[in-house]
Swiss-Prot record:
Name the record gives this protein: Probable cytokinin riboside 5'-monophosphate phosphoribohydrolase LOGL1
EC primary class: hydrolase
UniProt tissue specificity: Expressed in shoot apex, immature inflorescences and flowers.
Domain of life: Eukaryota
Reported function: Cytokinin-activating enzyme working in the direct activation pathway. Phosphoribohydrolase that converts inactive cytokinin nucleotides to the biologically active free-base forms.
Gene of this entry: LOGL1
A GO BP entry: cytokinin biosynthetic process
EC number(s) per entry: 3.2.2.n1
Length: 223
């Protein structure tokens, strides 16, 4: 009965700015329960807003937690995973729809194509690299989608401090420092992302990029 109620609530939820959000996160759960709790809360927040999930396709770690939460809540889940990672990142049954791609570049490009915004939960090198690429693509003008950082228990404080250092030392323009939106809770982060408007001047207009070469220009309908 509870599952049916959650699914009905998700279907009935009014559509906001985002139909699908891409979440980058670890294939590990981390050493403290607070990280898993944050993944569950973000999943519940997406469900409450009727937002579908695009993610890295794994069924383990934080990836598995958020994917199962969104799926159980009645919202769509699309996982994008390179064939080479399937043995290590999928344990047992996959969660939701899974699209298999050839490599990491294609994975990021497909996740970006399918999403209206991006959020990074705590994670390792891969999560940080995905986050930084989406920030860079925004700076370059390849996309204008919000990029959010769920700063769970200060996990990303050092990274945010590094961004501030880069701006202070003249390597990151002040307006580009505003590309990243951060908050300690899922509810606050989604609220900020709903209100986000681009304030930086992109390096080049989106129409000037060879999107087919970058693997980014198609809409979900064209994919």
């Amino acid at each position: 009965m509870g599952d049916n109620s959650a699914a009905a609530a998700a279907v009935a939820a009014p559509r906001g700015r985002f139909g699908r959000i891409c979440v980058f996160c670890g294939s590990n759960a981390g050493n403290r329960a607070v990280f898993g709790d944050a993944a569950l809360q973000l999943g519940q927040e997406l469900v409450s807003r009727g937002i579908e999930l695009v993610y890295g396709g794994g069924s383990v770690g934080l990836m598995g937690l958020i994917a199962q939460t969104v799926l159980d809540g009645g919202c769509g889940v699309l996982g994008v995973i390179p064939k080479a990672l399937m043995p290590t990142e999928i344990s047992g049954a996959s969660v939701g729809e899974v699209k298999i791609v050839s490599d990491m570049h294609e994975r990021k490009a497909e996740m970006a194509r399918q999403s209206d915004a991006f959020i990074a939960l705590p994670g390792g090198y891969g999560t940080m690299e995905e986050l930084l690429e989406m920030i860079t693509w925004s700076q370059l003008g390849i996309h204008d989608k919000p990029v959010g950082l769920l700063n769970v228990d200060g996990y990303y404080d050092p990274l945010l401090a590094l961004f501030d250092k880069g701006a202070a030392e003249g390597f990151i323009k002040a307006d580009c420092r505003q590309i990243i939106v951060s908050a300690p809770t899922a509810h606050e982060l989604l609220r900020k992302m709903e209100q986000y408007t681009r304030s930086h001047q992109e390096v080049a207009p989106r129409t000037s990029w060879e999107m087919s070469e970058l693997g980014y220009g198609k809409t979900p309908e064209e994919s």
